Amino acid sequence: MKRLTIITLALLSLNIMTAAKTNKTVTLRIIETSDVHGAFFPYDFIERRPMNGTMARVSTYLKRQRQKFGNRLILLDNGDILQGQPTCYYSNYVKTDLPNVAAEVINYLKYDAEVFGNHDIETGHIVYDKWIRELNCPTLGANIIDTKSGKPYVEPYLMLERNGVRIAVLGMLTPAIPNWLHQNLWSGMRFEEMVSCARKWVKTLREQEKADIVIGLFHSGWDGGISTLHYNEDATKKVAEEVEGFDVIFFGHDHTEHNSTLSNGVLCLDPSCNAIKVAQATIQCSFINGHWAITRKQGEIIDITKETVDEDYVKHFQPQIDSIRQFVEQPIGTFLTSMSSRDAFFGSAAFVDYIHDLQLEHTGADVSFNAPLQFDTEVRKGTVYMSDMFKLYRYENQIYTLRMTGREIRQHLEMSYNLWVNTMRTPDDHIMLLTDQSWDDKQRMGFKNLTFNFDSAAGIDYEVDVTKPDGQKVRILRFSDGRPFEEDQWYRVAMNSYRGNGGGELLVRGAGIPMDSLPSRIIYMSPRDQRHYLTEKIRHEGNVAPQSHHNWRFVPTEWAEPAILRDRKLIFKE
């Protein structure tokens, strides 16, 4: 009788629990940041002024969301967090005895998962392996394969359970890393194509892990970018359309805000960059017929700029903020003239030519390629500080020297100017290749293409005829020292490591050098980053008067000069 009573009570309890679960509805909120690029604190350490957005305001927003959702809030970061501000550089390479500030921020805000971005890989094993160890949450990368074990280098996915709902987060990175970065930065790794990788792991998540919700967290843009026979740089759209089983995909890398739901029901979100906005998915689940089903799903892009700064957050990180301020406020030298990145789009300009000087002096090359890495900044006459080094040179690239023929040099420049300038058919046409589409990545602002691929050359004199069709605009006249320039001769060409490894595809699609041949063309790689040598150069010179080389120009001048004035006013509101 006692045993029967116990069984009856157990069955009654099970029925009550089942009935309760049957009627249960759970609402989850998932928030993503992406491409934060060191925007941790409400101060721009490059421009030395207050900064919009930043994780200090994200923190305020998260506090409110945690009060409302508690453990039903899931917080994800989508990579490219280790480069972008002096904050990162200081933590990555200067003050290395302390935890990486990027790890400290992620830990303080209690993120559930992180993924790799290409700029995180660019910091090198010493930096990112330390960062991974210091994180309290897992770093995900299902398609980043350890070449020794054949298994993912980091965790492929994360399983979470919230109020009985099983949630899987699958992380992936764009496989185009070899197109930008030298293998010494990702030694022991290879990068799988995203569609096949996603298909394999979603099957595992649904069948073995019994996930009720599957979330993608991809450091890969929506569509486009580099496309090869083996992979696509920006493959999020392709994965969302072709791989069955995703409910939500958070993505980034392309610095372009996105919120859409595909015909197959997959919600796709991208918050753009610099912690200006966050991507947010709200998912309502109900327990129906013995399993959890999504009954409502909504995506939003939330503007963070109107949030107040979280003073508790700032107070917690005040020692780091003070140290970074001290670092960027170091005087380096004196500029006798001002120079602006704006000038670099309209002809030979000191802002770019000073980097050309550095590359030619450092390598002894015949020719130098360089593009403006900041879209709209100025280094003013007077004392130059460490912060200005990040204006002059934004990224931690090395200096490379490659062997190229004269023909390859011209073809490289042809592609650069194809991306850069319009083909003018009348004197009233635009000279710049512009678009009506609005970009918020601070790197285009009216231009159709990314301006960090607008390479000019030093060491040679040349003209760019804006009335000629693409591929026929560049006419190289001579070397700047008077030597003849020959298309069939081999020359030494200095450039940054991003370009030398294939970044922007100017060497591959432009110059026509096969991607797998690029390593054999490299004859020099600097041991330190370019900004280090730039800082040394200015310290050595003391008083610096940067000058334009005046070695190239747009022609015909009677069309080009008025068009430059019009487009400059249009782009920069001058």
Regions found by a protein language model. Name each.
Residues 12-13, 45, 90, 415:
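Alpha-helical transmembrane segments and their juxtamembrane interfaces
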Residues 24-29, 33, 39-48, 53-64, ...:
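Catalytic centers of hydrolytic enzymes
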Residues 6-9, 70, 210, 364:
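Residue-level recognition of short, structured coil/turn motifs
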Residues 17-20, 79, 553, 569:
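Intrinsic disorder/low-complexity detector
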Residues 21-306, 346-358, 368, 526:
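Acidic, metal/ion-coordinating pockets
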Residues 1-24:
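Bacterial Sec-dependent N-terminal signal peptides
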Residues 11, 20-21, 212, 495, ...:
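Intrinsic disorder/low-complexity segments
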Residues 3-5, 13, 75, 245, ...:
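Intrinsically disordered, low-complexity peptide-like regions
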